[in-house]
Amino acid sequence: MSFIRKKSMEFLKSFEVPAKNPSEEAQRRWRDAVGTLVKNRRRRFRMVPDLDKRSQAETQRRKIQEKLRVALFVQKAALQFIDAVRKTEHPLPELARQCGFSVSAEELASIVRGHDTKSLRFHNGVDGIARKVAVSLADGVKSDDAGLRAEVYGANQYTEKPPRTFWMFLWDASQDMTLLLLAFCAAVSVAIGLATEGWPSGMYDGVGIMLTILLVVMITAASDYKQSLQFRDLDKEKKKIDVQVTRDGYRQKVSIYDIVVGDIVHLSIGDQVPADGLFIDGYSFVVDESNLSGESEPVHVSTANRFLLGGTKVQDGSARMLVTAVGMRTEWGNLMETLSQGGEDETPLQVKLNGVATIIGKIGLAFAVLTFTVLMARFLLGKAGAPGGLLRWRMVDALAVLNFFAVAVTIIVVAVPEGLPLAVTLSLAFAMKKLMQERALVRHLSACETMGSASCICTDKTGTLTTNHMVVEKIWASGAAQTMSNAKGFDQLTSSMSETFAKVLLEGVFHCSGSEVVRGKDGRHTIMGTPTETAILEFGLAVEKRARIEHTGAGKLKVEPFNSVKKTMAVVIASPSAGGRPRAFLKGASEVVLSRCSLVLDGTGNVEKLTDAKAKRVASAIDAFACEALRTLCLAYQDVDGGGGDIPGEGYTLIAVFGIKDPLRPGVREAVATCHAAGINVRMVTGDNINTAKAIARECGILTDDGIAIEGPEFRNKDPDQMREIIPKIQVMARSLPLDKHTLVTNLRGMFNEVVAVTGDGTNDAPALHEADIGLAMGIAGTEVAKENADVIIMDDNFSTIINVAKWGRSVYINIQKFVQFQLTVNVVALMVNFISASFTGSAPLTIVQLLWVNLIMDTLGALALATEPPNDAMMKRPPVGRGDNFITKVMWRNIVGQSIYQLVVLGVLLLRGKSLLQINGPQADSLLNTFVFNTFVFCQVFNEVNSREMEKINVFSGIFSSWIFSAVVGVTAGFQVIMVELLGTFANTVHLSGKLWLTSVLIGSVGLVIGAILKCIPVESGSDASDRHDGYRPIPTGPSAV
């Protein structure tokens, strides 16, 4: 036994793949290990990517990148190389002319795709192109014209593989080799039956098999098609991206698929360029073209290099872009068509269960051969003793041998559990659909599965733990702090500051901002930007209204956008309050800005020296704000000489300190407590002031008395030994850089073997999201770069949603364990019953039709019932599954072995002594007994299915009616069993059972519930592991030892 177990473990090592980015070698290894023992390759590997097609797609991608590389670095020959023809004229289509356009779609596309500066100059630059596509660079496209533009220049859609129809799934399900063999046997059986027994009795057996095969194929295809619809809906959600455009003179959001040629698109850090286009204006604009060209060097886009390619990512700065080509006229469109051939990687659990299915299939094949051998041996021995011996064969004998072969094939149908890996897909599809309703979009199948094992969550603060609805609660200005939560506070502030101070303050608020105030169609002001910027701009609008001072527009001479590394943003404007002279404004993290200030502006507008004493008072105000859980930002300015130089690094004059309130989300404290109860450590990683971070962390229960709060600079200066000592205690990391988050995640996974989930929203979070076991991007605040590198998108940016993902992840894992336990029990009993009966009686009690029905119960219907059970709160009261834990636990083996022994003993006794025990007599005694055995076997499985809902708890009926799918499947199974026995006897080889025998069958099956309860009282492990739970989770210790 130990030898078999050892060999099985060695074999299953081939089926170990990482959850993220598995190598091609690992993927090919498990495919090779599966071998030829597969009933239906089309269905079993439908969700498994074709590695050869993926390789071809990668080759095509490299070709596209090579062409673009030529376009970027050999611009003179770019168009000739890309189009493989000499430059030709692009005739203007009549439709375009009639619509008022004077340039063709092909010519527009070739300008950007080939970086053709000569053609751009020929068309008089961006302004000339704008005129030829009939658009104003200020007002943008008219919404009423969008449909016409899509008709002339094309829609921003990419060619995708057509969705699979139901008939395709029906075809896949019918390609099962064992079912095809059975269909052949059924056809031969009909032919022989008609020849020997005549019409219609001679056709019953064969037609019964055919009808059952048809039923199996239909139900399988329907289940698979339903899954495909769910995945299709999820895929549509994944591709939803909104971009900001100017249309009808107003800024607004539209879907990336609604972009048309002529649109004016606004781009900022982290955005994906939605189509090919030309740079209009912007600041410090840098894009990453590596996914198209393969070159890692960032590209600076400006008036000197205006070409923007769809699919590239904005790395820095902001800009406006004129769209010139969309959809399949862009290289990104061609690349997307190629990449769609690759498919998604299979999950580790799917691969592992392919290994389990292969082992069980080999055992089943051996039993099928043994059963056929035993049946044939007994038949030949009986025939040898009959008159004529082995030399005399009749049609009846041929029919008997054919039946033996069909029984053996049917055993293989039952024994090879191809439903195991497919059940994972079913469970994941169900979970992903439910999570979508709960505002979590799972981008990768494996993430949902892995999240169930998460032992640590590294979360942002802003927007995740807090509401992200920010307001300026307090302000330090003119040497004093003011509360701004009501009208009185604003009145006190405006009355204490001079007009000079107010103008400088408002200039800084409105011009040193990555957001902007725009007027909507209804005439109301709308702020487009981040919540932090929105809070400050709303404060500025309120001050303007009360002080009756309007800020004056000013041209921006230079801009340094905010990023999470510098923690500041800066701008140089031609300041109206300084007579049009250049003035630099600096805004950002309080400590950073304050350290670069040497002067301070008082309430009268005079500049004073920022002495050490004054600096300490400002720092005290910042600390006081932070201790009240307020985010703090400083605003400063400096008059500069000239307009084209660098933004000053120091020597600024401090204007004000803002204390911004971002309230804790409702339910966050309870969600954090749920994490702790589930054995999941929560760590806050934020760029905020450490006092702000500590206050919020204490409020939501993350920071405890024995936990550590550390700042990023201190953390990154630790050596590996110090990190090994301190990381387990870290609960808060403040003033951190994205690199610090990446380092923390890497060490948690490497040093401590933790399964780490990480939240992120910025472009610079991409490395940490990629490194983590589960990357969680914010759907509202997150950039497109962050979302692309994430495994799950939290649509509402809510920490409680992350807990739902973890709960559903655990549910998937446990549900598959339940299904495996149920299916293995059915497998063992079905194989042993037919083998033992063949050995002792020379016939198989379970006929072909009956075995196919059993296969349907344990495969498709069993997966539907058990793999779609919703999660319960008890799942979050146990620590997570470890990386190295066995999927099939000792508790599962206990239940499988116990139930199998009970069923085998009962069915064995019935087969050998059933007639006398049940007092069955008469000419139909054998048929009656076989029907009773079949009926009892099915009801044993029905009650075992109920038993499998809980692998450890005795109460298996808890929440059974909340799982309507489970209840429906059990009801349908029982109902169809009645129909098979009472109405389809001719085809199913059954006879009518009396009420007494029906009751006896059900009672024997229900005793399985009692057996299950007794088994759950039997301890399966000793020592510290004795408390391991049914699903691989260990219960949390209680009492003094839990501390």
UniProtKB/Swiss-Prot annotation:
The N-terminus contains an autoinhibitory calmodulin-binding domain, which binds calmodulin in a calcium-dependent fashion. Pfam families: CaATP_NAI, Cation_ATPase, Cation_ATPase_C, Cation_ATPase_N, E1-E2_ATPase, Hydrolase. PROSITE patterns: ATPASE_E1_E2. The keyword Transmembrane helix applies. This is Calcium-transporting ATPase 1, plasma membrane-type. Keywords: ATP-binding, Calcium, Calcium transport, Calmodulin-binding, Ion transport, Magnesium, Membrane, Metal-binding, Nucleotide-binding, Phosphoprotein, Translocase, Transmembrane, Transmembrane helix, Transport. It catalyses: Ca(2+)(in) + ATP + H2O = Ca(2+)(out) + ADP + phosphate + H(+). Belongs to the cation transport ATPase (P-type) (TC 3.A.3) family. Type IIB subfamily.
